[in-house]
Regions:
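Compositionally biased, non-globular sequence tracts
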Residues: 1-75
Length: 75
């Protein structure tokens, strides 16, 4: 198995978050449109949080540290 490049992994998640924001809205209306937008928002949040994480490998375990405090309260 190839070595895990944690920094590259985080970059890919940041790129995925950006791609979700640029994703065009398909030609749907009503409930389908609402569901698509809701899913896109959830996808963005998930990818962005992982992309912003501090990652370490500890004894073979990938640890992602995600600071959920407001930006003005981070250390």
């Amino acid at each position: 198995m190839a070595a895990l490049d944690v920094d590259a992994l985080l970059v890919r998640f940041r790129e995925r978050a950006a791609a979700v924001r640029k994703r065009p809205l398909p030609p749907v209306a009503g409930e389908e449109r609402r569901a698509f937008i809701e899913q896109a928002n959830q996808d963005f949040m998930d990818f962005a949080m992982v992309g912003d994480a501090q990652a370490t490998l500890e004894d073979g375990v990938l640890v992602l540290r995600i600071d959920l405090r407001p930006a003005d309260q981070r250390g």
